[in-house]
Amino acid sequence: MAAASVLLLLPSPFLRPSSPAHRARCGIATTTTTSTSGRRGLFLFASRCRPGPRRRAASAAVPPEHGLSQPQPQARAVGSYEAALGDAKDALYAALEGMNRGIFGMTSEKRSEIHALVELLESKNPTPEPTDKLQDKVDGCWRLVYSTISILGKKRTKLGLRDFISLGDFFQMIDVKEEKAVNVIKFSARALKILSGQLTIEASYKITTKTKVDITLDSSTITPDQLMNIFQKNYDMLLAIFNPEGWLEITYVDESLRIGRDDKANIFVLERADPSEV
């Protein structure tokens, strides 16, 4: 046998048969034999083998360039969540249009619509432990946009809030570092040349749970004196309506909207406001 030839003996189960073209190109002759153990084998006589055409290594498929910028599932989920949250807030504002914060009453159908939207937002609360993030989420100035506090019937008449006095904005300033809250309720008296004034209620609070605070009334004043003279007779009634004392649970808060429920079963919806408006 030529020196350039090599004799190989391999068990057939471990040998993949070469193609006829490969055997012809390499000058391979094959013959079958049986070993003393009874196992069949294959003899390959290989001479100088001409190299065949090289195959290109398979490479991983590369997605189109535009595919690289497609949002990942998690990003899409976040986007969908934020969109749903925005839609719910828009729907709530639309439902509150013309309701004057609900203080002077509304139909049961409208109340049910508003409360369903409030509960929807509460179920999507992006801040599940708000008292841990009071500085970031709650500190600052807020304006009341809805409340279940109501001034109806004889109360409204006694307080002169039908025609004589108009109820203006309700602001709340929260100082987290001092654990203080100041509520400012604006009024104007038409009969007194559009006299404007306000009821200011100062309170302190203590965190009790991840969602609740206990509130203590510190003081209350009405300014100017002319407005105090109007409310003097029914001042206790007025204070009882707006007294914040008790516990308050923050059920929803983000950068622009806050919802709370108190121990008297009241609901409060507030939006971020500019302190210069107070």
From Swiss-Prot:
Disruption phenotype: Reduced growth and sometimes seedling lethality. Strong reduction of levels of plastoquinone-9 (PQ-9) and complete loss of plastochromanol-8 (PC-8) in leaves. Severe increase of photoinhibition at high light intensity. GO terms for biological process: plastoquinone biosynthetic process. Keywords: Chloroplast, Plastid, Stress response, Transit peptide. GO terms for cellular component: chloroplast. Residues 54-75 are annotated as: Disordered. The keyword Cytoplasm does not apply. Residues 1-74 form a transit peptide. InterPro entries: PAP, PAP/fibrillin_dom. It comes from the Eukaryota. It is found in: Plastid, Chloroplast. Pfam families: PAP_fibrillin. Essential for plastoquinone-9 (PQ-9) biosynthesis through its interaction with the solanesyl diphosphate synthase SPS2. Binds to the hydrophobic solanesyl moiety, which is generated by SPS2, in FBN5-SPS homodimeric complexes to stimulates the enzyme activity of SPS2. Interacts with SPS2. Belongs to the PAP/fibrillin family. This is Fibrillin protein 5 homolog. It comes from Oryza sativa subsp. japonica (Rice).
